[in-house]
């Protein structure tokens, strides 16, 4: 879990930490700066999805007083994600990024427990992953 109030942070030396969902979720610049020639980007939703910011902005308003930095990042999360996808698509056209994304999520959402739907999506992922070998060689 990543959102203050909904989840408890991990505290290290008195500083609360949450998972990376509020950070750079598509760190292409970092990967290339670290020396990668090519990047494989694995998405959990179809590549054409544009992330809406309505829910994030509402929650940001709720947590703003207690967690101002997290609220600021949460309010910008959709914008950052959409910009990252756009950049990934440009780099994919140049042959520098391979985007692996389901064409259909098979009804699977974050808390889905339907084993049949999960297996179907997993199998699609295995098939899609075959493109990685050709890309990195």
Model-derived features: positions:
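Patatin-like phospholipase
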Residues: 1-137
